[in-house]
Amino acid sequence: MNGFDAVLLVAVLLLTVVVVGAVLVGVRAVRGLAGTSRPDDPAFIAEKDRQEQSLAALRSAAEEANSTIDAAKSAAAAARTEAAAARAEAKAARAEARRVLDGARAEAEAILERVHKQAETEAEQLRTAARRSGEREAAVLAVTTRDQAAEVERRAVRMDDRERLHTEEVERLAERDRQLSAANAALEARESALAERDRELEQAEQRRRRELERVAGLTAEAARGELVEAIEAQAKREAALRVRDIEAEARSTGEERARHIVVDAIQRVASEQTAESVVSVLHLPGDEMKGRIIGREGRNIRTFESITGVNLIIDDTPEAVLLSCFDPVRREVGRLTLEKLVLDGRIHPHRIEEVHDLARQEVAQLCQRAAEDALVEVGITEIHPELVGLLGRLRYRTSYGQNVLKHLVESAHIAGIMAAELRLDVPTIKRCAFLHDIGKALTHEVEGSHAIVGADVARRYGESEDVVHAIEAHHNEVPPQTVEAVLTQASDACSGGRPGARRESLEAYVRRLERIEEIAGGKLGVERVFAMQAGREVRVMVRPDDVDDLSASMLARDVAKQIEEELTYPGQIRVTVVRESRVTEIAR
């Protein structure tokens, strides 16, 4: 029921009450008149007529009120009908509004979804364009960097060649000065000898004259005695000349014989010599593996270089990467590590550390096997196991570009051939020649020359004094006293002095890098040192408990200053100190 219905109902009720009240008043007035007046009284009759008229008027008013009430009821019913229709229309309007609102909301959501998808598409296009632009810029930068690195490398090679030519020219001039000095000394000695001979001839002429003067006054017996003495002196002189000729002939024959023995030994050995390289090539199953090796933002390649100390060069060469390091052991460990990672397919920092440990163990086994093969090739059976381990270290050690283990095998063969020609103890001399460079496996751990260190090691592990003396005397640090020591020297010189066996430029380069690592490794708190980029960068790994951030910067400055003071090198050397803290917890 709305407000209009309520007002209409109240009006009807009020009108009903008024009509009923008027009827009651009329009835009561009629009854009063009936009780107080007589029927034949004119006043009574007039009053009665007036009351009847009033009653009739009241009845007509009541009827009119009833009709009004009926009209009001009809109007109220019509109003209720209209209100119901209005409510139905309002309900339909609300339903229509709700339907329109739902449609608008669905349309808005669809528009929002389309706008969102379009925004995502445009964002993806922008990201793709940015990534392609970054890749193009990175490729251009890589090409520029590679060209600059190649140019720097070419300049370094030219500088090394120029330095080598300058060194050779200085050595030739020094050799020429020595030859001129020797020639001048020989001329002066010859002039002195000629002057002395002239004086001796003049003195002999004077003695002969005095002798003739004296003989002229001697008797026959005295002259005979003088003649006998002269003949004896002449015989002694001829005998001395004969002895001198025999000695000269023996010396000439001995030199010829020795030369024949050495040449025959070298010809019979004639081992091949391959120049040691500082770069290894690893072939990949496909170019997509290069991206996995690099890792996200270069994480894998940085971890690989910091753990192995080997430069990993990834360029446009199809299905291949380069590993560069001056240390052959490090380079071989890095090559095996990367090969195992590529075969396994799992390449991440933790896996790199695990595979690196396995590769180090495998390289140690390869060294042990190489030493055993060399012993079998030379023919040495009884030897201390510790010496076998030291010999295995020499598989990846070079001397002026010549592999030390191959040099020992070659020296042993040459010494054995020369000993057989001279009918000497072949096994002992081969053992001396094979062990003469054993000290090179410990020169980075023990102070002293490799000859003295090797002799001490051989003596400690039960080698004979002949072998020990040959080892310590093969560089004349101790004067050679036995034929074994002399033949060890000769075989060492024959193996190392052959054309193409050794290269001093590579050895100088390797020594410079080793000295750089020694300088940095001698500082307090340093754990590992790697010379990278052909010596142009030094990475120093420090222990975080011993070196803080301030000490790390001071350490880098000290290393750079000491390198500047002690070494001569082209260009500049960057010293990078890496301080890394690792905390590991196990969730159980």
UniProtKB/Swiss-Prot annotation:
HD domain ranges (all copies): 404-497
Q: How does it sit in the membrane?
A: Single-pass membrane protein
Record's signal peptide: none
Main site of residence?
A: membrane
What does the record give as EC number?
3.1.-.-
What the entry lists under NCBIfam families is as follows:
HDIG, RNase_Y
PROSITE patterns annotated for this entry?
Answer: HD, KH_TYPE_1
Subcellular compartments = Cell membrane
Q: Pfam families, alphabetically?
A: HD, KH_1, RNase_Y_N
Q: Which GO terms describe its cellular component?
A: plasma membrane
> Its family?
Belongs to the RNase Y family.
Q: Which GO terms describe its molecular function?
A: RNA binding; RNA endonuclease activity
Q: Taxonomically, what lineage is the organism?
A: Bacteria, Bacillati, Actinomycetota, Actinomycetes, Micromonosporales
Keywords noted in UniProt? Cell membrane, Endonuclease, Hydrolase, Membrane, Nuclease, RNA-binding, Transmembrane, Transmembrane helix
Q: Which residues form the KH domain?
A: 278-359
Q: Any idea what job this protein has?
A: Endoribonuclease that initiates mRNA decay.
Q: Gene3D superfamilies, per this entry? A: Hypothetical protein af1432
Q: Which residues cross the membrane?
A: 7-27
Q: Does the UniProt entry include the keyword Phosphoprotein?
A: no
Broad class of enzyme this protein falls into = hydrolase
Which SMART domains does the record match to this protein?
HDc, KH
Q: Which domain of life is it from?
A: Bacteria
The set of disulfide-linked cysteines is none
- Say yes or no: keyword Membrane present: yes
Q: Protein name, please? A: Ribonuclease Y
